[in-house]
Amino acid sequence: MQVSVETTSPIERVLTISVPAARVDEKVNSEVAKTAKTIRIDGFRKGKVPVSVVKKRYGQGIRLDAVEQIMRDAYVEAIQKESIQPAGMPSIEPKNFAEGADLEFVVKIEVYPEVTLADNSAIKVDRVVSDVTEADVDTMLETLRKQNAEWSAVERESADGDQVTIDFVGYLGDEAFDGGAAEGHKLVLGSNTMIPGFESGILGAKAGEERTISVTFPEDYQAENLKGKEATFKITVSEVAEQILPELNDAFVEKFGLEEATVAALRAEVRKNMERELNQAIKSKLKNALFEGLSSINEVEVPSALVDQEVDALRKQAAQQFGGQGFDASQLPAELFQEEAKKRAKLGLLISEVIKKDDLKVDDDRVRAFLEDMAQAYQEPQQVIDFYLKNKEQLAQVQSAVLEEQVVDKLLESAQVTEVTLGYEDAIKPNAQAEEAGEEA
């Protein structure tokens, strides 16, 4: 077998492969003989069909199947011989497969790029510094009280924080529009769950009162036919209710199933959970910043096959999150995910190179610590740990996450790090919101 390799780009190769006719004939004759032993033809007993008859009737189809198999086998031999690492499926095009002649075919493939990492000292990141204060715990306890609040009907004008029960119909001009009506809708004033101007238009209304308000839909509203449009809503208020918060006492604490039903025990549990959430948020922000920095200082040509894999993964993720059961992820256009997919594929190549360059291996002690920390959020931590340790697929995901943490540590050794102090609420916000808070401070 002869192989020639042409480099058409840093991530593309063209292989021209020639297989001797004798090897092809041997494969064809072997397949014909196998077929003769199993095929049924009228006038012949099973297994007694002459090879010449099989060749005459089925020879062309058998030869085509044999040629396809030889091309696949020869392709694998060729990439092993030439030490080529494909990044995706090959495109195989036969050039000559005439009987009696050498089989010739061309293979076009994408390969993994050679990655040369830039100096990590060029990476600049902010490391968030924050802690949980007593005031933060008080705020969280107040949130718990609100989540367990009851609503009591009142005979007064509605105010911010009240819950109103309303019927409404929306109009564009004189025509009611689809999706713009509801009956018995419960709305907490000040929650900002409706478009701007809707909630403020109900402030001060009493039960039984009717109001007509004018609003303008935002330019970025999800419904295309309503973006930027002026609309009128006719609203009937059937009830105004005020929030009745439960007392923060031992009776309230009993709802949470703690071993010790005291306010002090609840404060301790709330603080522990907040500190866990805060630490996870800080680690996540730092990891994301380091990975963004790693990507920004390195140029890598990304094989389209890797981008396509990420597009498929993002499609499935979006389908699970928004589509519900039975939703066909392939309906979502690839263009929606192309940019993010390319970023992820590039980052994956860079992380792999860091692991390879620094010879990083999964730290089993860190895997155990990762599992123990994660399991603390569950009622039976040991059961969670045992589940992961006994499930190879789940354990592999944890090991991958730990290896990413080790990459983060390696990048931190040389990156330029600036500490930024944030309060708890700002520290746990997504990156963009936290950056805005930091700028305002």
Curated annotation (Swiss-Prot):
This is Trigger factor. Belongs to the FKBP-type PPIase family. Tig subfamily. It comes from Marinomonas sp. (strain MWYL1). The gene is tig. It holds the Pfam family Trigger_N. InterPro entries: PPIase_dom_sf, PPIase_FKBP_dom, Trig_fac, Trigger_fac_C, Trigger_fac_C_sf, Trigger_fac_ribosome-bd_bac, Trigger_fac_ribosome-bd_sf, Trigger_fact/SurA_dom_sf. Residues 161-246 form the PPIase FKBP-type domain. GO terms for biological process: 'de novo' cotranslational protein folding; cell division; chaperone-mediated protein folding; protein transport; protein unfolding. Involved in protein export. Acts as a chaperone by maintaining the newly synthesized protein in an open conformation. Functions as a peptidyl-prolyl cis-trans isomerase.
